[in-house]
Curated annotation (Swiss-Prot):
Residues 59-75 have a biased composition (Acidic residues). It comes from Mus musculus (Mouse). The keyword tRNA processing does not apply. Keywords: Developmental protein, Differentiation, Nucleus, Phosphoprotein, Repeat, Spermatogenesis. One of its GO terms (cellular component) is cytoplasm. This is Sperm microtubule associated protein 2. 'Kisimo' is a Japanese word for goddess of easy delivery. Its main location: nucleus. SMART domains: THEG (SM00705). Residues 1-78 are annotated as: Disordered. Interacts with CCT5.
Amino acid sequence: MGELGEHRASLLSNPIPEVKTLGELKQGQNNGNLDLESEPFGSHWLQGSKATTGRTSEEPEEEIPPEEMAGEELPETSNLDGPLQQDLEVEVVEMSHLSITERTPSVSTAKGRKKRSRRLLELAKPKTNWQCLRDRTGRCCKGYAWISPRKTNLQFCLYWPSVYWTERFIEDTTLTITVPVVSQRMEELSRPKRFYQEYYNNNRTTPIWSIPRSTLEYQASNRLKQLATPKVRNNIWSINMSEVSQVSRAAQMAVPTPRTLRLAKPRPPATLLEEWDPMPKPKPYVSDYNRLLQLATPKALSEKCVPDRSPQWEVLDVTKNAVASSRIISLAQPKIRKDLNEGYNPYYISPASLVAQASPRIYELATPKYITKKV
C-alpha cells in the first residue's frame, strides 16, 4: 500500500501531458480519435484493476485458514479489517481513473498487491495468548494433555510422550499444532505387557511352558550326572593360617645376627624438611683415615698356608752384572706420538697425480654447462 501511495504522489507532482482521464477517453471515443490509450487498452486496464480490487478484498479471507486461538481474541481484531479494506479500495479506485502510457499494469503487479494485502491481514491478527494455559493442571504432548492428579500449577510444555503411560489421554483442543493421529494398534503396542501373577504362582496346575513327553522320559547318562553335580568349594578365608603354613624347627631355633636385628627395626620419621626432599643429593666427601689404614693393611695368611717361595729372595750376581743391548734400549724408549695436525700438509699433491694424463671423457665431464643469463 505504501508503494501505491508513493507512485500516486509522484504522478500528481510531475504531470504528464499524455495522461488522460476517464472523461477524455469517452470524448475521444465519440470523436473517433484513437490513441495509444484508446478504448480497447483503457477499458481492459480498468476492468483488470476492478477485478483485482474485488479479488484483493475477497480472496484473503477465503485462502487464509483460520487459526485456533488458545485464549480469547483481542477486541481490536474485528475493527482492523474494515479500515484496511477501505484504504485498499480507495487506492485502487483512484489509480483506476488514471492511464499511464510509460508504465502499464501487469499480472505481476496484481500478484504483488495480493501478497501484500494478505501479509497485512496476517500481521493484523494478534498472537496466541499462551498465558491462559499457565494454571492448567496437565501435561501437553503432541496434541494431547495428560491430566496429572498430583502436580498443580504446571507451566505449558511440549515434549515427546512416554510409551509407558497407560492412563487415558484427553484431547487438548487449545493446541494449534498439527500432529498425526495415533492409531489404536500403535497405542496397543506402546503399552507395556501386563505382569500375570498367576503364571508365577506356586499353586498353579499347569507349567508356564509345556514340556514334551520325550524330554520327561529321557534318561541322563553318567557323564551328564557328573557334570550336573555342583563342585565343592572350600572357603580359604575361614581356614586357620597356622594349619597352612608350617614353620620348621630350624627356623624357630635360629638366632638372628645384629645386622638382621638392625634392619628389622623401623626407620624413625624424618624431623627436618630437607629429609623429606624426594630428590637425592650427593653426600659431602669426608675422608676416613682409620678406614684407609684398615684397607691398606695386608690380609693375614693362615698358619697352614705354605707359599711357593719366600716373598723375600736374593738377586743373582749375573742379573746385577748384565749389560743391555742396543735393541733392548730402543725398545725401552717410549713411542713418540704426534699431535692431530702436526706435520700435516693439506695442499700436498702426490707425484703420480702430477704426471697423469686426462682422457677426452674426463675433459668432457669437466667442461661446465652453459648457463643462460636471466633477462
